Design a protein with these regions (language model features):
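Beta-strand repeat architectures
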Residues: 1-39, 46-60, 68-136, 143-157, ...
Length: 192
């Protein structure tokens, strides 16, 4: 069992953490993956603390997690295949259920995020890398001052009344919206 009461777990090689080794977030904890490495974990993450993904490597979460705090991406890639990989759905709107400082969220199967699960940008850019043939649907509000970049050939559907203020860039795949607000707050004057 691994318990975070603060501090950092740093991984220096690619490997799979035994799924029987539960992770408890008594307080905030950081998982730092070194460059070019991948940590895969399919066990349960529980507790009320926040979990931060740091380091330029990749963290793969595949468990039905019950943690109630925020998930933060500071750098590198967080890879998921289900909303449950991010923990319990908030009972009411949480603007920071998923927080980007920078880094990438990679989606390997179609995922729908509940409208109570808000996403906030605190850094310069948030990358959404959606694999081919899959869709990430964000029903909550995306807020903050950072930009959004769409990567991967899959589809990103933005259904919320989003308030983020920087640019939206499509490098690959599709972004689907049903209203202007899907692309965040409109500029105060024309821009190009």
């Amino acid at each position: 069992h691994l318990t975070f009461n603060g501090g950092v777990l740093r991984t220096t090689a690619s490997f799979t953490l035994n799924s029987n080794r539960g992770i408890s977030l008594l307080s905030n904890g950081t998982i730092l993956t070194d460059p070019g490495t991948t940590l895969t974990y399919g066990g349960i993450i529980a507790g009320s603390g926040n979990l931060l993904k740091d380091g330029t490597g990749t963290l793969v979460l595949s468990g039905n997690n019950t943690n109630t705090g925020s998930i933060g991406i500071n750098s590198g890639t967080l890879r998921i295949s289900s909303e449950n990989n991010l923990g319990s759905v908030p009972g009411s709107f949480d603007s920071d259920k998923l927080m980007f400082n920078d880094g990438t969220l990679n989606i390997t199967s179609s995922v729908t995020l509940n409208s109570n699960s808000g996403i906030s940008y605190t850094g310069t850019n948030a990358n959404f890398d959606i694999n081919n043939g899959t869709t990430l649907t964000i029903n909550g509000i995306v807020s903050g001052g950072g930009a959004m970049t769409k990567l991967g050939t899959g589809n990103l559907t933005l259904s919320g009344v989003n308030t983020y203020t920087a640019t939206t860039t499509i490098n690959a795949g599709t972004i689907s919206i049903s209203a202007d607000s899907g692309l965040g707050a409109a500029p105060g004057s024309p821009s190009a």
